[in-house]
Design a protein with these regions (language model features):
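Primarily marks hydrophobic transmembrane alpha-helices of the MFS/SLC 12-helix fold
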Residues: 64-67, 266
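Symmetry-related core transmembrane helices of the 12-TM Major Facilitator Superfamily/SLC fold
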Residues: 154-171, 354-372
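C-terminal ends and interior cores of transmembrane alpha-helices
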Residues: 72-86, 272-285
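Helix-loop-helix hairpin linking two adjacent transmembrane segments in secondary transporters
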Residues: 128-174
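Extracytoplasmic gate region of multi-pass secondary transporters
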Residues: 18-22, 197-251
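Cytoplasmic helix-loop-helix junction between adjacent transmembrane helices
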Residues: 95-132
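Juxtamembrane intracellular "pre-TM" segments in multi-pass secondary transporters
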Residues: 175-203, 389
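C-terminal transmembrane helical hairpin of 12-TM major facilitator-type secondary transporters
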Residues: 261-308
């Protein structure tokens, strides 16, 4: 469990690295709002797609070995960026693609942890391992300060230090669960998706919760800079407060879902998120109130992430590996759409409001979709195990 958490934590830190560095990078390279948004969104999208690939690799060579390979690739990418420099939009996007490998750590950390625990504790186990997304807090807190002190180029080199240490710990203490793991093929993903409405529902649910978390985590430094004139360091601190709330709440969301049922927890999350983001879209009340709204928003989204993965093992017991990859991919695509969409709409409308209201509408859509199937799920799954639906 600890190895999964630590691996996930540091992977998320570097996956998110361009988010808190977006202000100094954009100033140095002369990027507009739309380009800046694309810069922070590309790692999210690439991480989403690569999760399927890394998940299949983990089934063939083991989650631990796959994690080691991925971590080495990320370290090499950051070292190369540090030595060669990042001096153009094209180079930033290339680095974003390579940092997407770190985002694919989802497909290693969660199965590595979850296979050790029975169904009634899946929400707690997945929540604790998934709390590794708190690595975004580390990036938001320290990356802007390090960029101010040493330049953003050197931040890439400095990031290699904790990654190397984490890799050593992971190699020494990570253990595979003593259970057989079926190898996934591309056909397995198609089999789960074709004619299976629940698979698509869960992908949509997670595209809202994790997509909202990752998208806002990447977009908020630029948002606070544009809306309230925060410098990179202050914007990073404000974002860190939001992300910390969501990261702490993820394991708590799993615990709450274990106790009250994942559907009840998730329904509450969607209503709260839609309300909070809808209010934030009006931009009234100044920086303090807006920051408070986003702290509460990411807190709810973090809890929603835990609730989703309390439900997934109940519905897809034997296909948990396949569904983890698909749902994780959907979450990443949702995060890409949110981060990029906010920037594009800001560039062309002069305001973040429309993007936020659209996201609030998607959250309401998640509530309506879940409300329509909750009774059926509770009746069908209630005899399948001890976990609450």
């Amino acid at each position: 469990m600890f190895a999964s958490f630590l691996y996930f934590d540091l992977s998320f830190m570097v996956w998110y690295l361009l988010g808190p560095l977006q202000v100094p990078i954009a100033q140095a390279l002369g990027l507009d709002t739309q380009q800046r948004a694309l810069m922070v969104a590309v790692p999210i999208l690439c991480g989403a797609v690569l999760r399927l690939v890394l998940g299949m690799l983990a089934d063939r060579i083991g989650a631990k070995r796959a994690g080691v390979v991925a971590q080495l690739a990320v370290i090499a990418s950051l070292f190369g960026a540090w030595q060669l420099g990042v001096h153009s939009m094209g180079q930033v996007l290339l680095l974003g693609v390579l940092l997407g490998i770190a985002g694919a750590s989802f497909a290693v950390a969660l199965p590595l942890a979850s296979r050790w625990y029975p169904p009634e504790h899946q929400g707690t186990a997945m929540g604790i391992a998934g709390a590794g997304n708190s690595g975004t807090v580390l990036a938001a807190l320290f990356a802007p300060m390090l960029a101010l002190a040493f330049g953003y180029q050197n931040v890439f080199g400095l990031a290699c230090i904790p990654l190397v240490l984490t890799l050593l710990v992971f190699v020494l203490i990570a253990r595979e669960a003593p259970i057989p793991v079926a190898r996934k093929r591309w056909a397995d993903y198609g089999r789960v998706l074709v004619g299976n409405r629940d698979a698509w529902r869960f992908m949509f649910f997670y595209s809202v919760t994790f997509g909202g978390f990752s998208g806002f985590a990447s977009a908020l430094p630029g948002y606070f800079h544009d809306q309230f004139g925060f410098d990179a360091r202050t914007a990073g601190w404000a974002t860190a407060a939001c992300v910390l709330a969501g990261s702490v709440m993820r394991p708590l969301g799993g615990v709450i879902a274990d106790r009250v049922g994942g559907t009840r927890a998730l329904l509450a999350v969607y209503l709260l998120v839609a309300t909070l983001v809808g209010i934030a879209g009006f931009g009234a009340g100044g920086a303090t109130i807006t920051l408070g709204l986003f702290v509460l928003t990411l807190l709810c989204l973090g809890g929603g992430n835990g609730a989703v993965f309390q439900l997934v093992p109940q519905r897809f017991g034997q296909d948990i590996g396949v569904m983890t990859g698909l749902i994780g991919m959907a979450g990443g695509i949702g995060g890409f759409a949110l981060a990029a969409g906010l920037g594009v709409l800001k560039q062309h409308t002069g305001s973040y409001a429309i993007g936020m209201w659209l996201f609030a509408a998607f959250a309401l859509g998640g509530w309506a979709l879940l409300a329509g199937v909750k009774t059926q799920w509770r009746s069908e799954w209630s005899t399948a195990g001890a976990a609450r639906v």
